[in-house]
Design a protein with these regions (language model features):
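Intrinsic-disorder/low-complexity loop/linker signature
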Residues: 48, 143, 160, 188, ...
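Short, flexible coil/linker elements and helix-boundary hinge sites characteristic
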Residues: 35, 85-87, 131, 215, ...
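Intrinsically disordered, low-complexity regulatory regions
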Residues: 229-309
C-alpha cells in the first residue's frame, strides 16, 4: 500500500493561517469532487493543524476553483451558461453583450464582438481557449475578489519582500527604508506565504466580508465559517451563529472584517461575556440593517456599523 505524502503542515493561530487552512480545505474538496484524488491523498487535519500534499496545488487548478467558487463574478462563465441554453430571451441577449465588455479582460479577448444569434460557437470557442486568462485577470483585479484581500500583483508570487495581504504590504521602492529601524530596511520583519492566496475563500462573500477565527479546532473553524459563506446579510447570520455556538465557546472569539471600501482588515473581538448573554437569550433575534438611504438611493450610506457598534 502506497504511503500518503503530506509534505506541508499549517497550524492555526494567527488568523491569516487559520483562514488559509479554511481556504485550502475548500480547494482540496473541489479537487476531490472533480475526481482528481481521494481526500485521504489530498489532506488530513487534527484539532490545530492541517497536513496536505502540495503537489496537488497548481495555478490551473487554483483558477478553475476560483471559476467555480466565485462563479457569479466570472463574466465569461455567465456568458457561457447562457449560450449553452437552447433558447435565449431578449434580456439574456442584452446581458451577454454587456458581459462581453464588462471588464478589461473581456474586452481584450472579445474586442468589438457582439452576440448576433449566429456567432454562438465563435464566442464559446474564445472562452474555452482563453478561460484561464479570463479567470485570472477577472479574479486578481476584482474589487470583490482577490484585490479586496491582497495586492493584485502578488497573486501566485513567491519570495516576496513584503506580505501580499492589503495593509500588510508596502511599496518597497518608495517606502522600504522608512519601514526599518533607523532607516535600515534589514531590520524590517514581515511574514508572507504562498498559502495566503487561499485566504479569500475563507471569508464570506458579502460586501463586508467576515472570517470567524474560532480556532478551538479546525472542525469548528470550518463549521463557523460555513454558516456565513453565502449569507446575504452576514451580520444577522454571524450573530445567530454566535448564539448557536455559545454552548461550546468558552472564550473570546476573534472576527476579522474586510470591507470593500477600506484598504485594511479590521478585528472585532466577541467577548465571552457577550457570548454568555447570547446563551441565556431564548428569543434573541438580531436583524442586520443592510442599507439606510438618505436622499440619493444611488449613493446609499452604509449605516449598520454606525448604529450597532
Amino acid at each position: 500500500m502506497e504511503e500518503k505524502v503530506f509534505d506541508c503542515t499549517v497550524e492555526t493561530g494567527d488568523w491569516r493561517y487559520s483562514a488559509a487552512i479554511v481556504g485550502l480545505i475548500k480547494y482540496f474538496d473541489f479537487l476531490y469532487q472533480k475526481g482528481v484524488a481521494d481526500k485521504s491523498e489530498l489532506y488530513e487535519f487534527e484539532d490545530d493543524y492541517l497536513r496536505y500534499n502540495s503537489n496537488y496545488i497548481s495555478e490551473e487548478n487554483y483558477l478553475l476553483f476560483v471559476e467555480k467558487y466565485f462563479k457569479d463574478a466570472m463574466h465569461h462563465k455567465v456568458v457561457e451558461n447562457i449560450l449553452l441554453k437552447d433558447e435565449l430571451s431578449e434580456d439574456e441577449i442584452v446581458l451577454i453583450n454587456d458581459k462581453l465588455k464588462a471588464n478589461q479582460a473581456m474586452k481584450s479577448i472579445f474586442g468589438k464582438i457582439k452576440y448576433t444569434g449566429e456567432n454562438k460557437e465563435e464566442i464559446l470557442d474564445l472562452i474555452e481557449k482563453n478561460r484561464l486568462k479570463l479567470i485570472k485577470e477577472t479574479y486578481r483585479r476584482g474589487k470583490s475578489l482577490y484585490s479586496n484581500f491582497a495586492n493584485e500583483n502578488l497573486l501566485f508570487s513567491d519570495n516576496n519582500k513584503v506580505c501580499r495581504l492589503v495593509n500588510y504590504c508596502a511599496d518597497m521602492g518608495k517606502k522600504g527604508k522608512s519601514l526599518g529601524y533607523y532607516w535600515d530596511n534589514n531590520t524590517f520583519k514581515f511574514k508572507d506565504e504562498k498559502i495566503f492566496d487561499f485566504i479569500p475563500f475563507a471569508f464570506s462573500k458579502s460586501y463586508d466580508a467576515f472570517f470567524i477565527n474560532n480556532n478551538v479546532s479546525i472542525k469548528e473553524l470550518k463549521k463557523s465559517n460555513s454558516f456565513i459563506e453565502n449569507s446575504e446579510n452576514t451580520r444577522t447570520t454571524l450573530f445567530g451563529n454566535m448564539k448557536e455556538s455559545a454552548e461550546y465557546i468558552g472564550f473570546d472569539v476573534e472576527v476579522i472584517l474586510k470591507s470593500r471600501d477600506k484598504n485594511y482588515y479590521e478585528t472585532v473581538y466577541v467577548r465571552e461575556k457577550a457570548i454568555n448573554i447570547f446563551k441565556q437569550s431564548d428569543d434573541f433575534d438580531y436583524k442586520g440593517i443592510k442599507f439606510w438611504y438618505r436622499d440619493d438611493e444611488k449613493n446609499p450610506k452604509y449605516m449598520e456599523p454606525e448604529i450597532v457598534n
